[in-house]
Amino acid sequence: MSGILGCFSTKIGMNQFERALQTMAHRGPEGCGVEVLPQVPFGKTVFIGHRRFAIVASSDAAHQPMRVDNWIITYDGEILNYKELRQGLEAKGFSFFSDSDTEVVLKSFIAYGPECMRAFRGMWAFAIWDESAKQLFLARDRFGIKPLFYFSNGEDFAFSSEIKALLLLDFVPKAPAIDGIKSFLLWGPPEYKSDTMFSGIKKLMPSHYLLFELESDGSLSDIKITKYYSIRDKIQPKNTGITFPEAVEQYRHHHRKAVEYNLVTDVPMGCALSGGLDSSSNVAVLKSLLEERSATNMREKLVTFSAVYLNQPDRSCDESVFINRLSNYLGVTNKQVEPTSDCYIANVEKFLWHQEEPTGGASVFAGWCVAECISRNGICVCLDGQGADEYLGGYHSFIGAFLVQNSFLFWKNWPFLFAGNNSLSLKKAIMYYSSHSFSKISKRRFFRELTEQFGLNSSVLEE
């Protein structure tokens, strides 16, 4: 994790920019770099900053912002296949002065332009300033693992890893986005929109890049935002002709390969362990890979981290039994935290300062507690199990989506099930539809339309 910041403006100086960059010191405690590029004919100044947290190539040669000829990059991320990409660039005649993936990203862009990201495996948020063309390129990884925000008023422009840094720049308004707040209260976090809770500040969405340039009169050109990747293009149903056991074996192979790619690090590494299938699989594969690399004393080499709920009135979400069982079976160390209500009250200001926007549930705070525990234990890189529920259908809400697609017999027989105002069938249907599928307002609207369409007694809903 690192922090990136940049702006194009006539309104701020070096002191203000450095103060804004300092708000992200936690993202890069190992160093700080700033590049100042006065655009003399235009009266604007380009500031490009970086807070460094190195997990690959920690030498000074990898210092950022990094310049190669007319191109300057500030980069937060990790390209897992950077060594292979470097070999390809060397074959094209490129030479390298560092062992960093930062240099590989920059020279890949010089060689291929935005198309370079098609070959990247990993996570990234970066900005490249082309001093010759007076052009800025911003990009974010396919799934939005790395954060990237920006602000533009047509005259000034800024980008950052975190909102708080933008708010310290004079030309960025310090005001709430009322429509964004209303939308959050009605529908939950705007995960699939570029809006934030702050006026004028946008997210660069996952799988997108942004491009603009300084015009001859010093004004900013229109911002062009392009989507460079769509997962739909990769998952269209195909008749592969393979059996279910063959599909399982392919999945196992790809999962193991993904974990292996994430071992590209020069610092201590841990693994999150929730007790579920996804994180448990990660821990088992990670331990196996480390053993293959002849790592000694595995109990010391691999540490796992978990959130547990041992002292809660409702222990239905506590998975400590599975966590302890797997830790003992694999012989790995496990560190546990318990995110209680008292813990939340004691840490709410710090949590919100880091989170910056409202969250959709308490699980985000639990994740924050685990991350803090990881940091306290000196672990710099931690493998997590995020994403498995999305592509393996692990959420209750997917039941509703399945029904809406008209692919389930239950949905086709909907009117028949409620014939004669059968309250028992209705209750079963409501349970089947899943109480986790929609927000309260969405469910209320759905059931209101249901009663009107089929002439049902609304008192059934009150039960």
What is the predicted function of each stretch?
Residues 155, 213, 310, 324-463:
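Glycine-rich active-site loop/lid subdomains used to bind and stabilize high-energy intermediates
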